[in-house]
Amino acid sequence: FYSEERVTFLQTQAGKKYVLDSTLEKVEAQVDPEVFFRLNRKYISHVDAIEEVLSYSNSRLKVTLRNCADTDILVSREKVTDLKEWLDR
């Protein structure tokens, strides 16, 4: 799931995109936190969509998602520990 210019989208692993009549906050409350994680203000990712996680400047992480054109998905310092714990499950 991602948000762009106040519009929320669902993107499948096959790359298809669908517009949702919802906010990311509402989506986050509805999805299973065991398999979905709020990466930042713009992205919620399924565990299987995460291709790579790299250390980035200022104690942040850079996440690469499968079938995603945005290559600079940054996770804030505040969420780094939560993301690492979530991935280690």
What are these regions (language model features)?
Residues 77, 81-89:
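C-terminal output/interaction extensions
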Residues 1-72:
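Conserved binding/recognition cores within well-folded domains
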